[in-house]
C-alpha cells in the first residue's frame, strides 16, 4: 500500500513565493533569486511530505503562477500576441501571458476563470485553427531531476489531455475537439521524455467528475490508448476529484492506465461500483492467463482520496479507514493507494504555525502538512504487515479519537438563540415588497443618477500605509482611536479621488478590511481567524479563509460607522458594502457537522440585520457581493437544484427587508451563467455587476437570451492586470454591451475590486472608464 498526494500548496509556509515573484516583477530581485526561492519552497514541500509519511511526492504541481499556464507552455500553446521569434519560452513569457505586461507593449492577458467549484483561478489556454502544438518537456524534466537529486521518489503531475482541452477556449469559434489528435501527439512526445526519467506519471482528468456528453466520454478510451502506445512501460495514474465519477466510472476503469484515483470525500458512492467492476474483471482474466496486467482492468489499482483536501477539519480516521479496508479486502494491499481527496493546494500549509488559535479549536484542525500525516495514519491502520498494531499507530489513533470526541461535546459550537431566530423565518421574509419594475421608479427618484452611471465594485488600493496601520494596531503600536483616525482619512481620500474622477455612485474604499470575508468573520460569532492560514487564489493573490466552526450570530453593526462616515463627506450616494451569505460560506473553511443550507441561513440573518442598520442610517444603495455563488454550484447537475434553492433563498433573506427606494446591488466573479441564469434572475437584485472584460462581453449574451429584467454592470476593464486600458477600448466594450441590453439598464464599472492595484493605474483606468461612459451616454 502506497501513500501519495496529488499536489501540495505552492505558496510557501510564509507566502515566500508571493514575495519572490512580486519582487521580480518590481525589479527588486533577479531571475536567479526568484528561481532560488522557488527551489527552496519545492524542497521544503517534498521534505514535509516525506517526513509526514508520504511515499511518493508530486513534481509538476508547483507553479510560479498557475499550473494550467505551465502546461500550455509545455505544449507550446502560445497565442500570437505573446509570440516573439527571439523570445525564449521562459518565465518572462509566462508572466506576460498571465498579466499582459512586459515586452514592447501591453497586451490583453489570458482570460482567467474559476478552477471547477473552488476559489482557485486558472488561466484559460487559447486555441484556434492555426494552433500548432510544440511540446517541450525540459522545464518538467528539470524539476524531476531536482527531486531525484534530493533523494525523493517523484511522481510527475500533468493535466490530462481531455481536461486540458476542456479547459481551453477556441477563440475562433471552432470546436476544441478537432484539435485532439494533434494534442495527443504532443502529449505522447511529452510523456515519452518524462517517462525516461520518471516512470510514474499522474494525469489529472477532473472532467470525469462532470456530466459529460456521450461524444466527449467516448473520446477517452481512444485518447488514452494512444498515450499508452507512446509510453507502454510507464505507470500512469489517472486522477479525478471534486465530485463523484458516477456514470463515467466504467470509462475511467476501462482506460489503459495503472492506477485510478477516486475522491471518496465528495464521491463516497464511487467505491462499491469501482470494486465491483475491478473484481469482475479479475474473475474474467485469471492471473495465470499470460495476458499483461498493467493497464488492464484486472490489474488496475485504486488510489483512494479519503482525507479532505479542501477543508481543514481533522479527519475521522476510523471512518476514513473503512473504504480503504474494503478495497484491500477486494483487491489486496498492493492495489490500494491512500491519498487526500484532491491536491492540497486548497489548504493552508502548516497548522504548527498557528500559535495564537484557541487551543480548543486548534485540536479540531489539520492543514496540508497534518493531512499528509493523516494519510499515513489511515494507511497504517489498514496495513497487513504489522503497522496497524504498532504503538505509534495506536497513539495517533487515540489522539484522533479524543479530538473528535472533544469537538462533538464542545459547548462553543451550538448557540440556542441562533436556532430560535432561524425558527422565526417566514417565506415572506425572502421577497421584496414589490417587483423590480415597480420599485425602479422609486430608486431613480431617490438617487437621480444619469443614464449609464459609473461606479466601482468596492475596494480601492490597499496602500503600504493602510497595511502598516493595520499591522501596528495588531501589534499594539497604535491605539484603536489612532487606527480609526487613519482609516477615516483613507476613506476621505477615496471619496475625494472618486469625486475628482466624476464617478456617480461612490464607495468608501474598504481600507479597514483586510479581506472581504475575513473582515466579517472577525466580527461574527462562530468564526475564528488564523494568523497564517493562507491559500492561493490566483497568481500571487492569496486569501486567508476564516474558520467557521459554530453557529453564526451578529453581536452588533459591522460596517455602519465606516459607510456613514463616507456618506457624510459627499452629496453623491455611497454604497454600503457587504459580503453575501453564500460567499462567506464558500470562502471560509466551513464546519462539516451541519448541512450547508443551515449555515447559509444563519449567515443570511446576520447580513439581513446589517442591511437594516445601513438603511436606517440613510444609506440608499447597498451592495451584497456574491462572487462565489456560481463557484459553489456542485459539479453534478443532480445536486444543482438543492444548492441553488438554498443559495438564492439565503440571498433574498439577506436583501429583502428594505424599502422600494433602497437599491440592492450584487457582484459576481468569473462565471458561466448559462446554466444558472434563472436563479441569478431570482436573486432579484436591482443591479448585478459582473466580470466580463476578458471575455469581451460574451458573458452578456445569456442576459439578452434570457430577457434579464433588472440592471447590469458588465466589467469593462480587467483589474487583475496592471495594464491601463484605453478610453476607446472601454467605449467599444460598453457599446457592445448596449447592443445586448438597453442603455438605461447598463452601468459602467471595472471587473472587480481595486484592492490589489496601485493608485496611479487606478486613477488612469477610472478616468478612462468615466470618459468612455460619457462618450456612450452622450453619443447614444
UniProtKB/Swiss-Prot annotation:
Q: How is the cofactor bound?
A: Binds 1 zinc ion per subunit.
So where does L-homocysteine get bound? 457-459, 510, 625
One of the GO biological process terms: methionine biosynthetic process
Q: Which reaction does it catalyse?
A: 5-methyltetrahydropteroyltri-L-glutamate + L-homocysteine = tetrahydropteroyltri-L-glutamate + L-methionine
Q: Residues that bind L-methionine, according to the entry? A: 457-459, 510, 625
PANTHER family named in the record: 5-METHYLTETRAHYDROPTEROYLTRIGLUTAMATE--HOMOCYSTEINE METHYLTRANSFERASE
UniProt xrefs under HAMAP family: Meth_synth (MF_00172)
EC number in record: 2.1.1.14
NCBIfam families xrefs: met_syn_B12ind (TIGR01371), PRK05222.1 (NF003556)
Q: What is this protein called?
A: 5-methyltetrahydropteroyltriglutamate--homocysteine methyltransferase
Please name the source species. Answer: Nitratidesulfovibrio vulgaris (strain DSM 19637 / Miyazaki F)
Amino acid at each position: 500500500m502506497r501513500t501519495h498526494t496529488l499536489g501540495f500548496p505552492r505558496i510557501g509556509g510564509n507566502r515566500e513565493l508571493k514575495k519572490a515573484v512580486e519582487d521580480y516583477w518590481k525589479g527588486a530581485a533577479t531571475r536567479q533569486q526568484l528561481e532560488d526561492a522557488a527551489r527552496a519552497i519545492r524542497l521544503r514541500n517534498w521534505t514535509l511530505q516525506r517526513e509526514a509519511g508520504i511515499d511518493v511526492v508530486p513534481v509538476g504541481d508547483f507553479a510560479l503562477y498557475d499550473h494550467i499556464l505551465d502546461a500550455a507552455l509545455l505544449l507550446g500553446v502560445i497565442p500570437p500576441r505573446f509570440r516573439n521569434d527571439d523570445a525564449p519560452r521562459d518565465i518572462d513569457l509566462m508572466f506576460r501571458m498571465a498579466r499582459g505586461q512586459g515586452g514592447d507593449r501591453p497586451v490583453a492577458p489570458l482570460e482567467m476563470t474559476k478552477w471547477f467549484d473552488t476559489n482557485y483561478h486558472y488561466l484559460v489556454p487559447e486555441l484556434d485553427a492555426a494552433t500548432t502544438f510544440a511540446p517541450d518537456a525540459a522545464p518538467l524534466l528539470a524539476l524531476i531531476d531536482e527531486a531525484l537529486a534530493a533523494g525523493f521518489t517523484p511522481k510527475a503531475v500533468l493535466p490530462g489531455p481531455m481536461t486540458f482541452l476542456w479547459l481551453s477556449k477556441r477563440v475562433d469559434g471552432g470546436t476544441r475537439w478537432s484539435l485532439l489528435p494533434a494534442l495527443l501527439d504532443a502529449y505522447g512526445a511529452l510523456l515519452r521524455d518524462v517517462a525516461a526519467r520518471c516512470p510514474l506519471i499522474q494525469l489529472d482528468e477532473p472532467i470525469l467528475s462532470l456530466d459529460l456528453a456521450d461524444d466527449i466520454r467516448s473520446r477517452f478510451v481512444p485518447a488514452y490508448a494512444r498515450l499508452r502506445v507512446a509510453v507502454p512501460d510507464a505507470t500512469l495514474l489517472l486522477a479525478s476529484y471534486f465530485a463523484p465519477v458516477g456514470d463515467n466510472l466504467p470509462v475511467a476503469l476501462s482506460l489503459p492506465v495503472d492506477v485510478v484515483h477516486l475522491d471518496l470525500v465528495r464521491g463516497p458512492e464511487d467505491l462499491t461500483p469501482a470494486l465491483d467492476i475491478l473484481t469482475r474483471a479479475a474473475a474474467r482474466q485469471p492471473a495465470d492467463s499470460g495476458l499483461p496486467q498493467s493497464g488492464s482492468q484486472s490489474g488496475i489499482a485504486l488510489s483512494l482520496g479519503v482525507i479532505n483536501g479542501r477543508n481543514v477539519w481533522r479527519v475521522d480516521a476510523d471512518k476514513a479507514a473503512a473504504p480503504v479496508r474494503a478495497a484491500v479486502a477486494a483487491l489486496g494491499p498492493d492495489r490500494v493507494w491512500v491519498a487526500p481527496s484532491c491536491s492540497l493546494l486548497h489548504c493552508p500549509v502548516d497548522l504548527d504555525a498557528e500559535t495564537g488559535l484557541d487551543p480548543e479549536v486548534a485540536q479540531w484542525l489539520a492543514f496540508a502538512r497534518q493531512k499528509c500525516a493523516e494519510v499515513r495514519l489511515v494507511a497504517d491502520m489498514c496495513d497487513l504487515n504489522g503497522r496497524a498494531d504498532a504503538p505509534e499507530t495506536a497513539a495517533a489513533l487515540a489522539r484522533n479519537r479524543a479530538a473528535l470526541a472533544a469537538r462533538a461535546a464542545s459547548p462553543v459550537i451550538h448557540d440556542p438563540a441562533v436556532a430560535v431566530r432561524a425558527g422565526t423565518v417566514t417565506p415572506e421574509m425572502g421577497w421584496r415588497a414589490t417587483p423590480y419594475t415597480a420599485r425602479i421608479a422609486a430608486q431613480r427618484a431617490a438617487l437621480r443618477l444619469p443614464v449609464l452611471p459609473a461606479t466601482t465594485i468596492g475596494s480601492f488600493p490597499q496602500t503600504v500605509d493602510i497595511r502598516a496601520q493595520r499591522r501596528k494596531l495588531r501589534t499594539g503600536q497604535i491605539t484603536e482611536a489612532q487606527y480609526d483616525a487613519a482609516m477615516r482619512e483613507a476613506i476621505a481620500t477615496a471619496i475625494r479621488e472618486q469625486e475628482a474622477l466624476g464617478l456617480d455612485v461612490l464607495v468608501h474604499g474598504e481600507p479597514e478590511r483586510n479581506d472581504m470575508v475575513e473582515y466579517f468573520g472577525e466580527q461574527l460569532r462562530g468564526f475564528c481567524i488564523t494568523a497564517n492560514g493562507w491559500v492561493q487564489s490566483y497568481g500571487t493573490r492569496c486569501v486567508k479563509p476564516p474558520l467557521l466552526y459554530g453557529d453564526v450570530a451578529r453581536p452588533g453593526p459591522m460596517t455602519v460607522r465606516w459607510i456613514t462616515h463616507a456618506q457624510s463627506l459627499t452629496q453623491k450616494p455611497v454604497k454600503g458594502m457587504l459580503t453575501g451569505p453564500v460567499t462567506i460560506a464558500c470562502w471560509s473553511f466551513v464546519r462539516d457537522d451541519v448541512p450547508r443550507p443551515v449555515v447559509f441561513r444563519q449567515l443570511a440573518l446576520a447580513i439581513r440585520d446589517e442591511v437594516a442598520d445601513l438603511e436606517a442610517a440613510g444609506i440608499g444603495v447597498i451592495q451584497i457581493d456574491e462572487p462565489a455563488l456560481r463557484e459553489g454550484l456542485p459539479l453534478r447537475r443532480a445536486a444543482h437544484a438543492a444548492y441553488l434553492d438554498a443559495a438564492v433563498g439565503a440571498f433574498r433573506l439577506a436583501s429583502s427587508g428594505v424599502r422600494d427606494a433602497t437599491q440592492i446591488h450584487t457582484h459576481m466573479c468569473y462565471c458561466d451563467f448559462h446554466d444558472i441564469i434563472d436563479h441569478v434572475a431570482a436573486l432579484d437584485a436591482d443591479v448585478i455587476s459582473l466580470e466580463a472584460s476578458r471575455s469581451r462581453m460574451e458573458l452578456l449574451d445569456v442576459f439578452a437570451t434570457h430577457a434579464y429584467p433588472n440592471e447590469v454592470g458588465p466589467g469593462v476593464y480587467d483589474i487583475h492586470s496592471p495594464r491601463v486600458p484605453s478610453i476607446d477600448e472601454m467605449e467599444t466594450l460598453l457599446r457592445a454591451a448596449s447592443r445586448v441590453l438597453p442603455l438605461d439598464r447598463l452601468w459602467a464599472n471595472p471587473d472587480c475590486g481595486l484592492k490589489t492595484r496601485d493608485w496611479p493605474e487606478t486613477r488612469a483606468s477610472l478616468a478612462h472608464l468615466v470618459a468612455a461612459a460619457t462618450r456612450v451616454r452622450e453619443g447614444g
